[in-house]
Amino acid sequence: GATLVVKEKIMTHGVQHAETKFYVDLNGEDSSTNVVSRSVAKEDSTQVFYSQINGNNKCAGHTECDAIIMDRATVKAIPALEANNLEASLIHEAAIGKIAGEQLIKLMTLGLTEAEAEEQIVNGFLK
């Protein structure tokens, strides 16, 4: 079976708008996909992530969206799964949240400013 792997990394700031849409049809026996999005939204930016996986045969599909939201930004994650075969195994995960205060404090105790600590966390998240 064929395998499709999609990995995206997005950072928006200012009034930028990013929208991604992934539609995957798993038609072949033992086909699979892994669609992963990691993003950071800052200031007044907006992001929309949409993924649709259709399991039309014996297959495995996974979609994941993890986002850090900052300032006044907005993030929307819309994962959709459709199993059209008894042997289709489909999973979706989505998590949106701010940088944890304890992460910032830990890095600041090592001598980083708050801005430097945020930058380190964001860079590590997107790697």
Functional labels for PLM-detected ranges:
Residues 1-112, 122-127:
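Conserved beta-strand/loop scaffold segments within soluble protein domains that form the structured core
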